[in-house]
Amino acid sequence: MQHCLEQSDITQYQQYYSSWCDARALGPRLSPVALSLLVGRNEHRLSAEPEVHRSQGRCVGVEVPREDINYLSTTCKPEIKSRNLKEDSEDQGRLPTRLPEIMLVGSQSFSPGGPNGIIRSQSFAGFSGLQERRSRQVLGVSPGITRAPSKDVYCKPGYACRVEFLLCKAFSKQTCNSFIENASALKKPQAKLKKMHNLGHKNTNTPKEPQPKRVEEVYRALKNGLDEYLEFHQTELDKLTAQLKDMKRNSRLGVLYDLDKGVLYDLDKVDELYEAYCIQRRLQDGASKMKQAFATSPASKAARESLSEINRSYKEYTENMCTIEAELESLLGEFSIKMKGLAGFARLCPGDQYESMDGPNPYQRQQGEVYFSLLATRRIGDGSCLSKGARIFMKYGRQRWKLKGKIEVNGKQSWDGEETVFLPLIVGFISIKVTELKGLATHILVGSVTCETKELFAARPQVVAVDINDLGTIKLNLEITWYPFDVEDTTPSSGPGNKTAALQRRMSMYSQGTPETPTFKDQSFFSNLPDDIFESGNAAEEKRPLSLSFSDLQDGDCVFTSSSTTSPSSSHSAHPEITITPAELTHSSLSSQNEGTEDSSSASSRNSLGEDHEPKSHSKSDTVEPKKPSVDARSGTESLFLENSVAEALLQESDEASELKPVELDTFEGNITKQLVKRLTSAEGPITTNKLFFEGSVGSESEAGRSFLDGSLEDAFNGLFLALDPHKEQYKEFQDLNQEVTHLDDVLKCKPAGSRSRSSSLSLTVESALESFDFLNTSDFDEEEEDGDEVCHVGGGADSVFSDTETEKSGSVHPEARGHLSEALTEDTGVGTSVAGSPLPLTTGNESLDITIVKHLQYCTQLVQQIVFSSKTPFVARSLLEKLSRQVLVLQKLAAVSDENLGNITSVVEAIPEFHKKPSLLSFWTKCCSPSGVYHSSAAHLIKQLEASFARNINKDYPGLAEPVFRTLVSQILDRAEPLLCSGLSSEVITVFQYYSFLTSHGVSDLETHLGQLARQVAMVQTLQSLRDEKLLQTMSDLAPSNLPAQQEVLRTLALLLTKDDNEVSEAVTLYLAAASKNEHFREKALLYYCEALTKTNLQLQKAACLALKSLEATESIKMLVTLCQSDTEEIRTVASETLLSLAPYSGSAMTSQIRQNYSTEVEAAVNRLVNLHLRASYTYLSLGFFFDPDDVALEGNERGGRALFQDVQKPSQDEWGKTLEAMEAALALEKNLNQALLDLHALGSARTDPHLCDFLESHFLDKEVKLIKKMGNHLTNLRRVAGPQPAQTGVAQASLGEYLFERLTLKHD
């Protein structure tokens, strides 16, 4: 073995040998070279290693006898007390100069080898190029170099190795970064470094594309650095202030004061810039969404003009962001980088061969003592020592630093440049490349790496150890100091500087007052409305009409005049009524009011509009005179203005621009914003002034469209497909449902864009745009209140997308009643999410039809889940499948309606032709639904109509039961497990198909007759619920099973009585159900209802159903109870288990033992719970076993460094296996599944080029699995031969004599 050593090193090593090892015991047995290998390093010299002296390219060294290495590894285990730093520094003078000093602290958390393994360096300070990135993890901050004592190892013969002792002082329990902090922050040198010609400035051109994510990262890092700087200097300032009395001069104190003020100034400036940047970023996002929405909306002249304006605004926001980035970059300070040298380290690498020495590790870590272990390092020759020299090239944006260095024979390094300055950049990383110089034309790339810079913003200098090559054997040591000040202003006086200053002046608006809402200029689709449109006060006040007129405003500027004499009563109107009228109507109807109420401010408003403003025509025959704003001082009516071009844009495509009629927005219809957007953008038909009432209806109600919609059409389709896909081949009904749903989805996706309502398209524009500007609706609107008139000219602003007028009121207004149009328009307008990347939602063009489809899709999803849960109980699944079949027919009708473009039908008969055969039911539904939505009605509205039509008759026969009866009917129509609460009626929707399907399936032709029957059930239920315990017991004992109908409400009440704490009541109900179960009709209906209740999500009802099935002795429900035993709720699992055990004696199964006596089911259930607890505890202890071992790598058999991660384990699919043949079939299927999983893992390992895994599976598992499957197959064949014939008339498996002999004679000895 060869080791490159200098003769002077051997002499020095021999001098220290007596300090660490007893020379009298070891000295005579070691050669001089082996003696030299015992020399360690001082603690702060840990990373320094002996240089390899090369002479003419060949290693000059001496032989190291193998026996010396073996003897050292087993015998020499010296230990010494650690010396203080002063002694170390004295000893350092007698040693030759080595590589630069780097403090290194170990890390255990990132150690791949563990405390007992040989650990490589993990001090990666960056990420390298593509070739090295494949085998190295990307780390911004290095976790440090780890050296820990390990088992004694040595190299096998044939490899040139170095053997050394490494100092370890319990380093493996510590953690550090590669950024080493000194005790105090270095002060900026007085003489500024001379920057290189290409380093003294940065790119003066602002970036073309903003980088928001990177700006946020750098902002956070810069802010943390400034905070740290401020904290450090304030600490020193407080220290000097305390010592001020003892000081004659306080000049240093003044310097700290200046630094403190400078840091605070920079912090404020950085925060202001970042806030402005965030605003511009959000404006850019909003403009981007507007571009998408307008690009997909129907083409028109106004739309094209608006799109052009959006593009201009988007470009300006982008330029503003780039300008702010450049300004922020100038506040980043500077990085002072000092070259500390290159360090080479030897490492154990993949491919090196070594073996561990047997025997326990004799070392024990104790505080204050130093131990040594023998470590065999990797072979030499990979660039660990650079003989000729090295060239380092650093690149940071457009900044460059090239330096050349040489490593002398004695290990001293000399570099032609030791320090430089880099100006930090927002975008970009520091790229470092190191090249070894072999000759004049021979250069070898040692490695290259790219380093993150955001961690360098720190108050104290940091020493960074950068791994240059992939193995970490070459490190570049740099000392980086960040100075946040003294950066010359390199921004030129012209160009971007002026724009930055102007931008800062504009951004000051955001910090000093109310933020301006973005606007389009004169061609926008939506203009401003005053804040108090949505004001509401006392409900007793009358509706206040607000006139919304189209007026001709130049450049989109809005002028609003507020009356100082507004009455308080008008300010608190309860239900504002918004009327949209053309300008000529406003002029004719309000001219007298204008004359009496106009003041000087309104006159100035007229002047601001321009005297020679030309009117624009709505059509060829009609012209609109420019109108003045008007205020009605008596009623508080305020005129709202929209641009005339908006009116043209909204009416041109509907061919109704010649006749514009006023419209009232009704507060009964729900959200006023949705109505406003719908009216402003609707092109479906003419709009009338009067409210539309259906004859005989309780009130006009469209329910604000999608306010009832729980999710969009896309969500409903996705949810149903997700529930249906795994089981769609299980039943024919599932296949039919999948076919119809797919057809309906295709119909909606294939509908042309023109068939979709324009209101939906443009409402999406409002939604997607105004939601982007939510951040502008701050509380600043409440901070500034002025009397008189306010004139705003924001329409012409080039840096905004929409404009919102800031309206101030002089009257007393309730704070919660104050609203802002942009905030109101930001609410959900009912437009769904996009599909397939398109901003247009999936829709039929009719909101009522959309709601109907969503409700039926959601109900189908619920039915599919219930059918899957009850699939092992045929009679329950059959009942649910019948319901699903009816829903398939409904979806078929919905697809036909959507495909034939009948979304705007106004008659229910067109959707359900069979409805004309039941005129009473049809007449009642037409009273419940509104003309805008014939497909659905709210539950609250339906109940109101029921009360208006049938409440008198119901209360006459059953006083006070009308409302419970109506709520029970609604819950049955919706197929709910229990009656709806009064609070939830307003959010529930009933579709016309649900209404018709329920009544026809129950044979109802007259609604009043059905309500009378339902009232009798409700009366009986309330009687049972209201009785005291004694009376209830008497009633239950007197009731005959034939006198109590097996209806849903009665059955539910009886089951809930079983959950009472009173044992006597529970026992009485149990006895009644047991007696009633003898009635076949009652038992059939009760069994079906309670089994279906097990599939519901109501936990209380599930528990009650279990107890009821227990009372009915319903063995038919055993399989459903077994499934319920796997519930996530402990209480349900317990009740289901007890019910299952109680049904065992009646099932005639093998669970009933003939020796069972005095062994209650409750005790058996408790024993089973204990058994399962022990089983889970053993599973948990298995996991804890891996935790208590400190390192998984040390586990026997874990050759790859993996981890054991446990998953939930389900119970076996059945508790009884019947006869031996069935059990063997189940075992064979289990082994086949296991073998298939092994084959899949083998295929994955082969695809990932993992030969070790493939070989491991082939040699240990796959061969054994094949043999086992073969043997089980043979047993199964023999079992089928010896098993006797199964009697056809019995449903219980009977074991034959052949099976018995096979078990005893064959399986017992196998």
UniProtKB/Swiss-Prot annotation:
Biological role: Acts as an inhibitor of the small GTPase RHOA and plays several roles in the regulation of myoblast and hair cell differentiation, lymphocyte T proliferation and neutrophil polarization. Plays a role in fetal mononuclear myoblast differentiation by promoting filopodia and myotube formation. Maintains naive T lymphocytes in a quiescent state and prevents chemokine-induced T lymphocyte responses, such as cell adhesion, polarization and migration. Involved also in the regulation of neutrophil polarization, chemotaxis and adhesion.
Protein's UniProt keywords contain Signal: no
UniProt-listed GO biological process terms: auditory receptor cell stereocilium organization; cell adhesion; cellular response to chemokine; cellular response to mechanical stimulus; chemotaxis; establishment of protein localization; muscle organ development; negative regulation of cell adhesion
Record-listed Phosphoserine modification sites: 123, 178, 508, 682
Protein name: Rho family-interacting cell polarization regulator 2
Involved in cell filopodia formation: annotated segments: 196-254
Transmembrane segments: none
